[in-house]
A protein has these predicted regions:
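N-terminal alpha-helical transmembrane segments of multi-pass membrane transport
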Residues: 1-89, 96, 107-112, 441-480
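Transmembrane helix-loop junctions in multi-pass membrane proteins
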Residues: 4-5, 35-40, 97-102, 176-187, ...
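Transmembrane alpha-helical segments of multi-pass small-molecule transport proteins
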Residues: 22-27, 164-172, 193-218, 235, ...
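Membrane-interface loop-to-helix entry segments
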Residues: 24-31, 36-48, 185-191, 198-247, ...
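Helix-loop-helix module between adjacent transmembrane segments
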Residues: 32, 120-144, 150-151, 155-185, ...
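Alpha-helical membrane segments and immediately flanking helix-loop junctions
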Residues: 61-106, 134-137, 143-151, 155, ...
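Extracellular/periplasmic helix-exit of transmembrane alpha-helices
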Residues: 129-139, 143, 239-257, 265, ...
């Protein structure tokens, strides 16, 4: 029965990605890039400045300039800094997609898939800017913090409550269940290969740790993410840079191979090019989530003086994820010279690193994937919880959701790799399609906000937004 379900998943996934999602993703990314006049390139210095040098004002100001999320713990207001707000989103982006996803893309689509991952990041970061700016615009005031996301701009921006509920359900299924099953599956495969640990045993450990973290609340999520993500990213980047430097003479040929394969110059069969493009964009979206509607859930929780500030921050996250971390995985695999068709997923990354640094490569990747994937499980959980609260803000609903997430972590540990990925591909496609429709319809508002931000910067001001600037929708902008 499992095989039959898996076959259905594969067929549905192939149809969605071959005939619908790829075209829609690319068209929307190009459209947003044009409408914003290449915001992801023009304002990259501003993105870095906002992250590293947030403006300081009084914490009781709604329009304060420090990018932060406010959380009440034990009766006291706690601040989650701009850096923590950034890494909560980055924790979800940086995960299995960076190690196993890249390897799968290369194994199935060839080295050229890496090129299409880069293209999705370069153009798709404009989509990330639009969706996160809109999430900020339509965010709501909670008792102790702001909250929001695509479900909210669908309801209050488009006036379509049903669409918001549909998106919320898809978000819960995709991130709370499907993505977390992939993360769990990859961790267990890596640890089985490195240490011989049974996946079921590892699944139990993962499930218990997940319950411990998610019942601690967003403050614990932010603390965990802000500690783990930078450490794991730096270590992995250092190893990758070391591997590339050690094989520096191979790098020009690797880059040439990526470009040649991206356009089918060396392909033996005409259909291979299509597979290359699909794999690159599919795994690129799984990794950086640009336009998918996930990062806006974290972006909406930030307290900023202008919605564009958080839009720029999240666009930077797409660059960081794909152009830096994913590229590191790709270079490790391609400079190693291992047969990319001999293995798949995380095991290909393990084989490549073992080839470069010796037998320590296997356990190193296993530990690294634990950190990457487990931080993603926590980030994914938070996105799902936001949407559970959108449908019905009840303690019982959240409690049931937490148990369901833990159950999917356990299930993901024991199902096949193909089953986990196929399930995720379908829900990811539907979620992305729903979100892209909404942000295309609302893109005019995000462009207006960008123009307002740029104008204030030209006047030497620290940009501040007020809903009086958009009187036609002012009654829907609760937080401004």
């Amino acid at each position: 029965m499992i095989d039959s379900i898996q076959n259905i998943f594969v067929q549905v996934s192939d149809f969605l990605w071959s005939y619908i999602i790829i075209a829609v993703l690319i068209c929307c990314a190009v459209f947003f890039t044009w409408r914003t006049r290449f915001v992801q390139f023009r304002l990259i210095r501003e993105m870095v400045r906002l992250l590293l040098h947030p403006d300081k004002v009084q914490p009781d100001e709604i329009g304060q300039d420090e990018l932060s999320m406010d959380v009440k713990v034990d009766g006291e207001m706690k601040h989650i800094s701009s850096f923590q707000a950034f890494v909560v989103a980055l924790a979800s982006r940086i995960g299995t997609g960076n190690l196993a996803g890249v390897a799968t893309a290369i194994s199935v689509g060839g080295p050229g898939a890496v090129f299409w991952m880069w293209m999705l990041a370069l153009l798709g970061s404009a989509s990330a800017f639009i969706e996160s700016t809109l999430a900020q615009l339509y965010k709501r005031k909670g008792k102790t913090s702001f909250y929001g996301g695509p479900a909210y701009y669908m309801k209050y921006g488009l006036g379509k409550g049903w669409m918001g509920i549909l998106f919320a359900v898809l978000m819960i299924i995709t991130f709370g269940f499907a993505y977390n099953s992939v993360q769990s599956n990859t961790i267990c495969l890596a640890w089985q290969k490195a240490f011989g640990i049974d996946p079921a045993t590892m699944g139990i450990v993962l499930t218990l740790l997940t319950l411990l973290i998610i019942f601690g609340g967003i403050q614990r999520v932010a603390k965990f993410s802000s500690t783990v993500v930078p450490v794991m990213a730096i270590i992995y980047l250092l190893i990758a840079v070391g591997v590339v430097i050690w094989n520096i003479t191979c790098l020009p040929q690797v880059l040439l191979t990526i470009v040649e394969n991206a356009f089918g110059f060396n392909q033996a069969a005409g259909g291979v090019l299509g597979v290359t493009v699909i794999q690159g964009i599919k795994r690129g979206l799984f990794s950086n989530e640009a336009g998918e509607g996930s990062a806006p859930n974290a972006a909406a929780a930030a307290t900023v003086s202008h919605p564009v500030k958080q839009g720029l921050i999240q666009a930077l996250g797409v660059f960081t994820d794909t152009l830096v971390v994913c590229s590191c995985s790709a270079f490790i695999i391609l400079v190693s010279g291992v047969d990319v068709t001999a293995s798949n997923g995380i095991q290909l990354t393990q084989d490549a690193l073992t080839h470069e640094i010796g037998s320590i490569g296997n356990p190193f990747v296993a530990v690294m994937i634990w950190l990457f994937a487990f931080s993603s499980i926590i980030g994914n959980y938070y996105y799902g919880e936001t949407n559970v609260r959108y449908i019905k803000d009840s303690k019982l609903g959240v409690f049931i959701y937490r148990l369901a997430v833990a159950a999917m972590v356990m299930i993901g540990a024991v199902v096949s790799l193909d089953f986990a990925w196929s399930f995720a591909d379908i829900t990811m496609a539907l979620l992305t399609l729903c979100n892209l429709v909404a942000i295309v319809l609302l893109s005019r508002q995000a462009v207006f906000l960008l123009q307002d931000y740029r104008q204030q910067k030209k006047e030497g001001k620290n940009p501040v937004f007020s809903k009086d600037k958009m009187p036609e929708i002012a009654d829907q902008l609760e937080a401004w």
